[in-house]
């Protein structure tokens, strides 16, 4: 009898646990902030409002010690890892661009598809190079396609790779057309809600104003003075010093300038809201998924660095945009009915010249120069006039294998010469032949 009572107690206990499980969210929103360093959460914390980053820190859970087991950490790889839970050797995305079948390819480039919503080259994109499924793919499969999955971003790869193969749609910004587009991989024509959104011409509205600091510029104490020698310009050839006349820059550079302003993030959240309404996300019996990537933080970071006034101002404005978006979700989906997470695809380091001026050891790796040096050494060593090294990408050396084979050279010997040469470089920590990793 005691055994029976114990069994009943255990079964009842498990029943209680099952009944206590919370309901599944109606909508999951995953937000990736391109190039956001972890310390930005706290570096600008005192200036954030209560509804954005602070709300996430206060109401959510923060992973304070997250490490990545792969190299390099760039946009395409980072987004793929976040949304597939795998690494480059498994998901197949080895960089923003990489060598495939002896040719350098765009991570999402696909000439077998055609643009939808544009006639430009920006639409020849798909997730075909992604070898595995995303969270959204698995969600669609698990619910027999009842769940909806949509991805939005300015960058094509930041919309496509998170959304995956089986998404209802992925939409990215075409600089030439000034609107969000997709490809025939997903559909043959844009949904009406996307057409309506594009007709609003929000990019033009954002670019009709000036980009001024959100607060008095002398209060930006976390940044280097705005006029400095560590920046490339807001776009190459255009000085990065606020305020910026965006209307003049738009007239000169076209729609692409939106990427290099904080308002690119606002535009991204605008289409995210349109997607929620247009696809009725969060209104179904099964959980839906929306992937969002804020790309402007990366463009700005590359142009002016991590210590710039423009970068600080971008994150202060992003905080406001997040607060507005969360308030929108509270109203449309209902507080407690959605689950959101925020992460980054990769971080960034200070400008090397800036670090050197602070007496901190730093330098820059010149891959193109190294390719020339390696080819010169190989030509002399193997008595050939052909370039044996194709390129250096993503910390990897790629060879012209057909040329090596035609010349009758020992491929292993060629690689060893390169390994030995790279080991002499002070900036190179370790060099090895990938085919020998199990023995070295």
Specify the residue positions occupied by each region the protein language model found:
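Loop/turn elements at helix/coil->beta-strand transitions in domains of secreted/extracellular proteins
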Residues: 24-29, 59-63, 90, 144-149, ...
């Amino acid at each position: 009898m005691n055994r029976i009572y114990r069994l009943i107690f255990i079964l009842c206990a498990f029943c209680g646990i099952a009944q206590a499980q919370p309901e599944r969210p109606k909508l999951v929103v995953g937000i990736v902030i391109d190039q956001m360093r972890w310390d930005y959460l706290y570096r600008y914390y005192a200036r954030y409002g209560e509804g954005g980053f602070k709300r996430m820190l206060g109401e959510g859970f923060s992973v304070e010690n997250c490490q990545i087991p792969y190299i390099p950490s760039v946009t395409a790889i980072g987004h793929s890892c976040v949304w597939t839970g795998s690494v480059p050797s498994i998901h197949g995305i080895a960089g923003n661009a990489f060598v495939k079948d002896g040719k350098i390819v765009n991570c999402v480039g696909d000439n077998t598809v055609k643009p939808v919503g544009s006639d430009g080259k920006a639409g020849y994109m798909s997730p075909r190079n992604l070898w595995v499924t995303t969270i959204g793919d698995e969600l669609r499969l698990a619910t027999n396609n009842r769940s909806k999955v949509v991805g939005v971003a300015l960058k094509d790869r930041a919309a496509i790779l998170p959304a995956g193969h089986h998404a209802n749609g992925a939409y990215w910004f075409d600089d030439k057309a000034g609107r969000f587009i997709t490809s025939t991989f997903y559909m043959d024509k844009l949904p009406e809600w996307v057409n309506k959104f594009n007709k609003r011409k929000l990019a033009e509205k954002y670019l009709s104003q000036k980009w001024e600091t959100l607060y008095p510029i002398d209060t930006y104490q976390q940044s280097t003075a705005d006029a400095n020698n560590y920046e490339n310009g807001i776009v190459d050839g255009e000085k990065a010093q606020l305020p910026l006349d965006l209307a003049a820059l738009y007239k000169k550079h076209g729609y692409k300038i939106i990427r290099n302003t904080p308002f690119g993030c606002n535009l991204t959240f605008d289409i995210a809201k349109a997607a929620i309404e247009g696809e009725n996300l969060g209104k179904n019996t099964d959980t839906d998924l929306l992937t969002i990537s804020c790309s402007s933080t990366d463009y700005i970071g590359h142009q002016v660095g991590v210590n710039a006034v423009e970068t600080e101002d971008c994150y202060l404005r992003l905080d406001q945009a997040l607060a507005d978006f969360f308030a929108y979700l509270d109203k449309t989906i209902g507080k407690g009915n959605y689950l959101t997470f925020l992460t980054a695809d990769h971080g960034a380091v200070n400008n090397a010249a800036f670090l050197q001026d602070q007496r901190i050891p730093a330098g820059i790796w010149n891959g193109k120069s190294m390719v020339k040096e390696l080819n010169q050494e190989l030509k002399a060593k193997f008595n050939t006039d052909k370039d044996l090294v194709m390129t250096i990408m993503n910390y990897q050396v790629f060879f012209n294998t057909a040329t090596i084979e035609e010349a009758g050279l020992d491929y292993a010997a060629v690689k060893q010469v390169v390994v030995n040469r790279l080991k002499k470089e002070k900036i190179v920590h370790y060099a090895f032949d990938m085919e020998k990793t199990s023995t070295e």
